[in-house]
């Protein structure tokens, strides 16, 4: 990576998010669907054509520590969220940021957005349930953005516990 900031997009799809990072970032896409992985390679320096887990990541890229890890619209599809979070922590450097964007169950319920509940999403999270999951792994939400997308969603910014100041948005 030559001293560049390193970003990993898990569930990178066609690389849309990665294309917006500056060229001075080392961009890694994790995408299990072969057709999308091929598209993603236009914007990623490296594409791992597999589901994310520490073992496959380490085999492909070695024991790298990443600056930014994103999981956009895929966190609610996980069969083993504890294992996933544990594996993300293993690839993050101590000052790294993990960003999750997903449907927000509280907004969905208050807006009666039941049409956004779909069979492939295995779980939906509130901030408290996500914080409890992250705390088991020594991670915490340090900032949050509520969004209107998909009947209500939230983007959470996560770090190693105690590394960054926690924004007032987390307490509101």
Regions inferred by a protein language model and the residue ranges of each:
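Conserved class I S-adenosyl-L-methionine
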Residues: 3-13
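Conserved SAM-binding motif I beta-strand of class I
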Residues: 26-31
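Conserved SAM-binding loop of SAM-dependent methyltransferases across substrates and taxa
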Residues: 14-24
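Conserved SAM-binding strand-loop segment of SAM-dependent methyltransferases
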Residues: 43-57
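A conserved beta-strand element that flanks and buttresses the S-adenosyl-L-methionine
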Residues: 67-70
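A short glycine-rich, Lys/Arg-flanked "PGG" loop and its adjoining helix->strand segment in the class I
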Residues: 82-97
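Short, glycine-/aromatic-enriched active-site segment of Class I SAM-dependent methyltransferases
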Residues: 100-123, 127-129, 134
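Flexible, glycine-/basic-rich loop-and-beta segments that form/coincide
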Residues: 150-172
